[in-house]
């Protein structure tokens, strides 16, 4: 017999978008239920995504920094990896955060129902859980059911040596030779981790650069740093994958393809994600789901069914947790009666590689495509005292300005902890700041952060830390 629950709001999915929406609903006085397939809150991001990957990237960074100190007179022995302890560290990080979410849900009196939820009507969702079925009747629903890794039909995904991002983060073993299919953010982050732990890494990417969404000049800095660590096969694609007893054999074609099928101990398929819109029986609620699995929404996150909202990966690109969180707040506030809208000028993107590649607002390629009259100002970290002292002088900070209004419309940073420096640029774009606003803001010295102000000085023609191309010529 099914258990029945009634709620003013039900949130389907407890990733960052979903739990943020549920907690905001509760804070606004709404009786809220949240449905989650995992045993803990946090969704893919906290359990098998953003957070565990950052825990492992921290380990990788420390290993690489220790090796680099040899050049400065500090010599360590070869690191000895206890993979079980590394895994425990990752799990400790996850448990701390998911435990915190459980406490906040309890404090807010959010009812958590574990299991897979599907619509059975415009006001009902049935949850199939370990302890049986639960039917949730709701006044309003917020769909935050996320996405899953893309699978290709010619790849034997059932073989345990064929990984998706979830498998890679389980850290069951460190393969001797690992192929990363896809030179995007997820693939390169995992390449960083497994290289530091001892794997030989091949990366195959069909485009002519890694991280295709970013500008080439920024990616070039990253590629220069890692070209001796990874075997990069650009403008190349996988055509066949065969699982044999002694390994996974991969055939490729393109500019860098090997002549024969290459043997690997494991293959990570990191070619993107697909939304879960078609897994929810959405049609039973009258919801429109497009052919790719996305649910279309307006700026209030409302679907074609007025009392059902959708947020996060399932509503479209970019599939980023921080976008979903803000969408979740908007949906909750609209349900509570507020006239709020999701209308950001910019959404930041970060590849947490080493060095990090981060950008916000217009990229240079986007500005060109849109016919914007723009000007680029860059500050190389080779002129930064802090970067030189910290042994990361190969970084660069770039700002993109509207040439007519002098307003900043985009920015990018490549370098150690580059993602941490992105906030000022995002705020400047949202606030409509021009180059002078940024240049006249006093930035602390010596910091990597001051490179943002110095890039603005380059545009303004007031830079004194570099040769000034805009200086007045002496007679």
Curated annotation (Swiss-Prot):
Positions bound to FAD: 36-45, 54, 117, 313, 321
Gene3D superfamilies per the UniProt record, alphabetical: 3.30.390.30, FAD/NAD(P)-binding domain (3.50.50.60)
Keyword Flavoprotein: yes
A Pfam family matched in the record: Pyr_redox_2
Cofactor note: Binds 1 FAD per subunit.
Amino acids binding NAD(+): 182-186, 205, 238, 270-273
GO cellular component, one term: cytoplasm
Cofactor: FAD
Cytoplasm listed as a keyword: yes
Positions of disulphide bridges: 45-50
Active site residues per record: 445
Places the protein is found: Cytoplasm
InterPro entries linked: Class-I_Pyr_Nuc-Dis_Oxidored, FAD/NAD-bd_sf, FAD/NAD-binding_dom, FAD/NAD-linked_Rdtase_dimer_sf, Lipoamide_DH, Pyr_nuc-diS_OxRdtase, Pyr_nucl-diS_OxRdtase_dimer, Pyr_OxRdtase_I_AS
Any GO BP annotation: 2-oxoglutarate metabolic process
Miscellaneous field: The active site is a redox-active disulfide bond.
Family: Belongs to the class-I pyridine nucleotide-disulfide oxidoreductase family.
Function in brief: The branched-chain alpha-keto dehydrogenase complex catalyzes the overall conversion of alpha-keto acids to acyl-CoA and CO(2). It contains multiple copies of 3 enzymatic components: branched-chain alpha-keto acid decarboxylase (E1), lipoamide acyltransferase (E2) and lipoamide dehydrogenase (E3).
Protein name: Dihydrolipoyl dehydrogenase
The species this protein was found in: Vibrio cholerae serotype O1 (strain ATCC 39315 / El Tor Inaba N16961)
Lineage, broadest ranks: Bacteria, Pseudomonadati, Pseudomonadota, Gammaproteobacteria, Vibrionales
Gene expressing this chain: lpd
């Amino acid at each position: 017999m099914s258990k029945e629950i009634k709620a003013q709001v039900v949130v389907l999915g407890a990733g960052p978008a979903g739990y943020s929406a549920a907690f905001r609903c509760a804070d606004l006085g709404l009786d809220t239920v949240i449905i989650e397939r995992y045993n803990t809150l946090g969704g893919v991001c906290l359990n098998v995504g953003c957070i565990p990957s950052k825990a492992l990237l921290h380990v990788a960074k420390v290993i690489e920094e220790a090796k680099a100190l040899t050049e400065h007179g500090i010599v360590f022995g070869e690191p000895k990896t206890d993979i079980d302890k590394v895994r425990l560290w990752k799990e400790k990080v996850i448990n701390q955060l998911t435990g915190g979410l459980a406490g906040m849900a309890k404090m807010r009196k959010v009812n958590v129902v574990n299991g897979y939820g599907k619509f059975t009507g415009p006001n009902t969702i049935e949850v199939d859980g370990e302890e049986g079925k639960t039917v949730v009747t709701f006044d309003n629903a917020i769909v935050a059911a996320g996405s899953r890794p893309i699978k290709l039909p010619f790849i034997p995904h059932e073989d345990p040596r064929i990984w998706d991002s979830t498998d890679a983060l389980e850290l069951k073993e460190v393969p001797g030779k690992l192929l990363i299919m896809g030179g995007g953010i997820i693939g390169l982050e995992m390449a960083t981790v497994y290289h530091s732990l001892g794997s030989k890494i091949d990366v195959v990417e069909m485009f002519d650069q890694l991280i295709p969404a970013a500008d080439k000049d920024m990616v070039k800095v990253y590629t220069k740093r890692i070209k001796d660590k990874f075997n990069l096969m650009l403008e190349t694609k996988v055509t066949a994958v065969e699982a044999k007893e002694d390994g996974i054999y991969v055939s490729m074609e393109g500019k860098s393809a090997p002549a024969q099928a290459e043997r690997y101990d494991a293959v990570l398929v990191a070619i993107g994600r697909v939304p879960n819109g078609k897994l929810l029986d959405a049609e039973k609620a009258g919801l429109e789901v497009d052919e790719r699995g996305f649910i279309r929404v307006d700026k209030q996150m409302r679907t074609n069914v007025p009392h059902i909202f959708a947020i996060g990966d399932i509503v479209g690109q970019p599939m980023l947790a921080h976008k979903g969180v803000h969408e979740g707040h908007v949906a909750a506030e609209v349900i509570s009666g507020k006239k709020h809208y999701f209308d950001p000028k910019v959404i930041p993107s970060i590849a947490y590689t080493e060095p990090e590649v981060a950008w916000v607002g217009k990229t240079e390629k986007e500005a060109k495509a849109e016919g914007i009259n723009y000007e680029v100002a860059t500050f190389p970290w080779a002129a930064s005292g802090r970067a030189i002292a910290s042994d990361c002088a190969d970084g660069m900070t770039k700002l993109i300005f509207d040439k007519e209004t002098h307003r900043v419309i985009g920015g990018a940073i490549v370098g150690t902890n580059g993602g941490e420096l992105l906030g000022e640029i995002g705020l400047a774009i949202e606030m409509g700041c021009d180059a002078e606003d940024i240049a006249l803001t006093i930035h602390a010295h010596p910091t990597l952060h001051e490179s943002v102000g110095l890039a603005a000085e380059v545009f303004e023609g007031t830079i004194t830390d570099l040769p000034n191309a805009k200086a007045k010529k002496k007679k």
